């Protein structure tokens, strides 16, 4: 009888452990996590600036990084090598191309829950391959978080 009571207590305690939520109420919202898109240039940013847990597909040699800028029409990536969240809604980024030959400093600013602005501040300009030519992106790019994807 004593064993049965001990087993029941152990069973009840394990059930209550699984009932605990992994998200605490005191955690701040995670604004700089996920994918954001720019439909004009057909590019996206896959990011986790808070934990640096992104692995670039087919380029795993770089390890875990804060994120990358990808292109839906080309396999080249621009890697976010360092990210510092400076204030609520702003992050300073260090970005390099996947060859390591070009780098720049940029700021990613969150305007609202679905709109972000990437400002290229100093260094090289982000370039994409389009129609066998390099296309320089503007200094200011607007990205949207698509909740449907």
Q: Which functions belong to the PLM regions below?
A:
Residues 1-25:
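Bacterial Sec-dependent N-terminal signal peptides
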Residues 21-105, 125-149:
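Central antiparallel beta-sheet cores of small beta-barrel/beta-sandwich binding domains
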């Amino acid at each position: 009888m004593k064993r049965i009571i001990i087993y029941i207590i152990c069973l009840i305690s394990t059930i209550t452990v699984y009932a605990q939520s992994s998200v605490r109420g005191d955690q701040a919202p995670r604004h700089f996590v996920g994918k954001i898109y720019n439909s004009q240039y057909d590019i996206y940013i896959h990011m986790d600036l808070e934990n640096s847990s992104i692995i670039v597909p087919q380029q795993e040699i770089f390890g875990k990084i804060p994120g990358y800028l990808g292109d839906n029409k080309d396999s080249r990536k621009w890697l976010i090598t360092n990210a510092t969240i400076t204030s609520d809604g702003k992050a300073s980024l260090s970005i390099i191309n996947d060859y390591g030959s070009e780098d720049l400093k940029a700021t990613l600013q969150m305007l609202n829950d679905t709109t972000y602005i990437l400002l290229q501040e100093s260094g090289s300009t982000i370039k994409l391959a389009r129609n066998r030519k390099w296309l320089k992106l503007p200094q200011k790019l607007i990205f949207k978080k698509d909740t449907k994807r």
